UniProtKB/Swiss-Prot annotation:
SUPFAM superfamilies: Thymidylate synthase/dCMP hydroxymethylase (SSF55831). Pathway: Pyrimidine metabolism; dTTP biosynthesis. Gene3D superfamilies: Thymidylate synthase/dCMP hydroxymethylase domain. Its main location: cytoplasm. It catalyses: dUMP + (6R)-5,10-methylene-5,6,7,8-tetrahydrofolate = 7,8-dihydrofolate + dTMP. Its EC number is 2.1.1.45. This is Thymidylate synthase. The gene is thyA. GO terms for cellular component: cytosol. NCBIfam families: PRK01827.1-3, PRK01827.1-5, thym_sym. GO terms for molecular function: thymidylate synthase activity. The keyword Transmembrane helix does not apply. DUMP binds at R21, R123, R124, R176, S177, A178, D179, N187, H217, I218, Y219. (6R)-5,10-methylene-5,6,7,8-tetrahydrofolate binds at H51, D179, S273.
Length: 274
């Protein structure tokens, strides 16, 4: 995935130093886009190991509409633990907005599937996780925000839109805040997987996944890791195989997915900024 390495290099060479909510500090640019042809392999970063179970389980968790980390923890995925309450609650984050926007019964995922099947030329086939009514305050902790009825964190990947041409399904993600080293490889994999799942449900082939970032940043304590990753040569992309077609987008299981020939360089550890 040379596209991703080019992204890291661009931020490193052109980013401006900025403060941020976490106090860590970043090197930041505004506005960047990457395109991945899903016919040419699954865009899983190979210059470091990506933890596939976390990608898959988190996406299934979003699709379930859950906002409690119990399912994730039961499957040894702990990527949300720092922001949850003692009861495991995260407030009305992604799953809630996808499946029951603003608590008003609007199932955006079901609506998208229906529109793709009945009106694939529509320019309104999109899902928004950004709900101003529940954006948390930066003046109090994530846990305190949850108690007040807000989300623990505002959505970083805020909106995604589907597009059909020549019987191929493409998806474009708009990400307002992009942690280039830790988050973006994960987001690319997650939404590419979702695109494959939606395409299967709608009897479409896959087209492109397009990633569009707003504030794209490398945290100051990730520079050494970024340099290590940039020194590595990308390997051939793996292939995604979906082993069955369930009755609904909501019925997939972890075991339904195989990532064939995922060859990768060793993992690179880095601290997440909370």
């Amino acid at each position: 995935m040379q596209e991703y390495l080019n992204f890291l290099k661009y931020i490193k060479e052109n980013g401006v130093l900025k403060g941020d909510r976490t106090g860590t500090g970043t090197r930041s640019i505004f506005g960047y886009q990457m395109r991945f042809d899903l016919q040419k392999g699954f865009p899983l970063v190979t210059t470091k190991k990506i933890h596939i179970p976390s990608v898959v389980h988190e996406l299934l968790w979003f699709l379930s509409g859950s906002t409690n980390i119990k399912y994730l923890n039961d499957n040894n995925v702990r990527i949300w633990n720092e922001w949850a309450t003692v009861d495991g609650e995260l407030g009305p984050i992604y799953g809630k907005q996808w499946r029951d926007f603003n608590g008003q019964g609007i199932d955006q995922i079901a609506d998208v599937i229906q529109m793709l099947k009945t009106n694939p030329n529509s320019r309104r086939i999109l899902v928004s996780a950004w709900n101003p009514c529940v954006v948390p305050s930066e003046k109090i902790s994530p846990q305190e925000n949850v108690v007040k009825g807000n989300s623990a964190l505002p959505p970083c990947h805020a909106m995604f839109q589907f597009y059909v041409a020549n019987n191929k399904l493409s998806c474009m993600l708009t990400q307002r805040s992009a942690d280039a080293f830790l988050g973006v490889p994960f987001n690319i994999a997650s939404y590419s997987l979702l695109t494959n799942m939606v395409a299967q449900q709608c009897n479409l082939d896959v087209g492109e996944f397009i990633w569009s970032g707003g504030d794209c940043h490398i945290y100051n304590n990730h520079i050494e890791q970024v340099n290590e990753q940039l020194s590595r040569e990308p390997l051939a992309l793996p292939t995604l195989k979906i082993l069955r077609k369930p009755n609904s987008i909501f019925d997939y299981k972890y075991e339904d997915f195989e990532f064939e020939n995922y060859n990768h360089h060793p993992a690179i550890k880095a601290k997440i900024s909370v």
